[in-house]
Amino acid sequence: MLRIAGRKLSSSAATRSSSAFFTRNPFTFTDDSSSPARSPSPASLASQFLDQFRGFSSNSVSPAHQTGLVSDLPATVAAIKNPSSKIVYDDSNHERYPPGDPSKRAFAYFVLTGGRFVYASLVRLLILKFVLSMSASKDVLALASLEVDLSSIEPGTTVTVKWRGKPVFIRRRTEEDINLANSVDLGSLRDPQQDAERVKNPEWLVVIGVCTHLGCIPLPNAGDFGGWFCPCHGSHYDISGRIRKGPAPYNLEVPTYSFMEENKLLIG
């Protein structure tokens, strides 16, 4: 019962205070003269309205510019808001360095000069690398043609040149060699082939110097048939490069070649 009575009393008191506040006219303006009352301006009404609520807090709820108070701004913000062409430098923040020690100038000179030489060397290497990269590769050079001078080759001798990474045998045959190559019975050959099919000029025999067995290099002017002998597994080739004895299955390969002049041979 006591709690209910207390709640009724508190609610009735709040109702009376609020009704008293709203029944009171805080915005009444009177003039000292007997002139009729004037209607208040909006600015005065706002000021009086704010004055009614100032008692509810320790500080005024009005903005700082209405109360005449100006807060301090940082220097950077103040400079942005108030730009000026008069720039004042603070000399206290500038540090002056004394001139260098004369005894260390020679060392600095040598260090800088050495650095320039190093940079120049690096630039030179980069340029050389770029230029060399534009040249033909080894694979391209290997596929190029090879020109051979035949004037220095004596009859009955064999010379070896390198073409496409492989040795090429060039033999200048004598009349006896030519007759011996043509007198062979094709039925006795493992890889039958006439001598005329392997040469363009009977005097010159051009074959790739790689054994057709396992890729060894045969020895010229050797073997049982006066041609080539493979020391790896004992294959014998005759004066026309045909296999006559041993494990090799095929004759020595004949590359693509042509005679440019009487004593000029172009391989490839």
Swiss-Prot record:
Q: Which organism is it from?
A: Nicotiana tabacum
State any further remark: The Rieske protein is a high potential 2Fe-2S protein.
Q: Where in the cell is it found?
A: Mitochondrion inner membrane
Give every Rieske domain span.
178-266
Q: What is its EC number?
A: 7.1.1.8
One of the record's GO cellular component terms: mitochondrial inner membrane
Primary location recorded for the protein, binned into one broad class: mitochondrion
Q: Which residues take part in binding [2Fe-2S] cluster?
A: 211, 213, 230, 233
What sort of enzyme, by top EC class, is this?
Answer: translocase
Going by the UniProt record, its keywords in alphabetical order are: 2Fe-2S, Disulfide bond, Electron transport, Iron, Iron-sulfur, Membrane, Metal-binding, Mitochondrion, Mitochondrion inner membrane, Respiratory chain, Transit peptide, Translocase, Transmembrane, Transmembrane helix, Transport
Catalytic activity reads:
a quinol + 2 Fe(III)-[cytochrome c](out) = a quinone + 2 Fe(II)-[cytochrome c](out) + 2 H(+)(out)
Transit peptide span, please give it. Answer: 1-56
UniProt KW Translocase keyword: yes
Protein's name in the database: Cytochrome b-c1 complex subunit Rieske-3, mitochondrial
Tell me the residue ranges located in the Mitochondrial intermembrane compartment per UniProt: 129-268
Q: What is the free-text note on the cofactor?
A: Binds 1 [2Fe-2S] cluster per subunit.
Q: Which domain of life is it from?
A: Eukaryota
Query: What Gene3D superfamilies does UniProt report for this protein, alphabetically?
Result: Rieske [2Fe-2S] iron-sulphur domain
Q: Which cysteines are joined by disulfide bonds?
A: 216-232
Q: Which NCBIfam families match?
A: Rieske_proteo (TIGR01416)
- What are the recorded GO MF terms, alphabetically? 2 iron, 2 sulfur cluster binding; metal ion binding; oxidoreductase activity; ubiquinol-cytochrome-c reductase activity
Tell me the tissue specificity: High levels are seen in the flowers while a low level expression is seen in the roots, leaves and stems.
Which family is it part of?
Belongs to the Rieske iron-sulfur protein family.
Instruction: Provide the cofactor list for this protein.
Output: [2Fe-2S] cluster
Function text:
Component of the ubiquinol-cytochrome c oxidoreductase, a multisubunit transmembrane complex that is part of the mitochondrial electron transport chain which drives oxidative phosphorylation.
| Mitochondrial matrix compartment spans | 57-105
